[in-house]
Regions:
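Pocket-lining segment of extracytoplasmic ligand-binding domains
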Residues: 91, 172-261
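Short, glycine-/small- and polar/acidic-enriched structural segments
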Residues: 28-158, 165-170, 174-180, 184-190, ...
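Secretory targeting signals
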Residues: 1-4
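Secondary-structure end/capping motifs
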Residues: 228-306
Length: 324
């Protein structure tokens, strides 16, 4: 009979936990530091819905979600290496031309059906022509809300500066400025505007969905380091993201509950927003060259950049379309 030495037994006992640790390490989720350019966005609640539906777990990803007070602040975090992947505005692609080490990797949301220009309920402003020369609050300079305000002014024939743009960050700060008489209105999530209407505090005078038919309201960006050193993790993230979009299209009730928590409005409002906006979400992240041209040319037209960047310098098409 074969004799088993004490050394063999001890060695096996020591090796077993090492094998287990090795397997656990292999199965450990990849952490992604994920940022939203603003916190209370129905479109950006996709990340939270993916968490609630355990889609990130299925993709072996631990998503560490943070939110900022606008595109410019998120771009600072991307530059500082504090964020791996972010969701921000289409015009925010222009930050690449300013030296931010991040680039668009997937289209996310088409024309801005999710944004409104809101005034106080008591405001004398009733229609768009009343906005000439008025002070409109946006999140940050160079952000989507800035871009939309300047584009609206330009379309009205007033030039890009026919409406005064004031960057005041998050909605509470802008609403307070309106109540003090320091602002005449603000560009915000339509859902938040509906909530202010129900509270008797505000009034949406327009939605921005028709301002540009070929356009990206929101895009997904990734840092150069993420693209170069963790491309497969990025691919898994994008697969999880668009799996979540597919789930959202098929499960309105589930989406409404999570969306209401994230956007911090009533479920009845999120239900209304869902019906109006779900069709604007990209299903695979593929880029529309016409929309890219609209954005890059507008960056100079509206004074956000002093030149028109080359298309390929602001987006990367190697990761899309995404198959789920």
């Amino acid at each position: 009979m074969r004799r088993i030495s004490r050394r063999h037994v001890v060695g096996s006992a020591l090796a077993a936990p090492l094998v287990m640790l090795s397997r656990r390490a292999a199965l450990a989720a990849d952490t992604i530091r994920f940022a939203k350019s603003v916190p209370n966005s129905f479109a950006f609640s996709t990340a939270d819905i993916g968490t609630d539906a355990r889609i990130w777990t299925q993709e072996n990803i631990e998503l560490a979600i943070s939110a900022f007070r606008g595109d410019a602040q998120m771009q600072q975090a991307l530059t500082a290496g504090a964020v791996d992947i972010g969701v921000g505005s289409g015009p925010g692609l222009g930050f690449r031309a300013k030296g931010v080490p991040a680039i668009g990797v997937a289209a996310m949301y088409g024309p801005p059906t999710n944004l409104a220009l809101t005034v106080l309920a008591s405001s004398p402003i009733k229609t768009v022509p009343d906005l000439k020369g008025k002070r409109i609050g946006v999140t940050t300079l160079g952000s989507l809300t800035d871009w939309l305000t300047r584009k609206l002014s330009q379309q009205q024939g007033w030039g890009p500066d026919g409406i005064q743009v004031l960057p005041l960050g998050a909605v509470p700060a802008r609403l307070a400025a309106m109540e003090r008489g320091e602002l005449d209105g603000m560009v915000i999530e339509a859902a938040t505007g509906y909530e202010l209407e129900e509270q008797g505090k505000g009034r949406n005078i327009m939605l921005f969905g028709d301002i540009e038919k070929h356009f990206y309201t929101h895009v997904i960006v990734a840092t150069d380091e993420m693209i170069e050193k963790r491309p497969e993790v990025l691919r898994r993230f994008l697969r999880g993201w668009f799996k979540t979009i597919a789930l959202m299209r098929a499960n309105k009730d589930f989406v409404v509950k999570t969306g209401a928590r994230v956007v911090q409005v009533r479920e009845s409002i999120v239900s209304r927003v869902y019906d109006a906006q779900i069709g604007s979400f990209s299903s695979d992240g593929a880029w529309d060259p016409v929309a890219i041209d609209v954005i890059r040319n507008s960056l100079k037209e509206l004074g956000i950049l002093d030149f028109v960047p080359e298309a390929k310098t602001i987006y990367n098409d190697k990761f899309v379309p995404v198959k789920i």
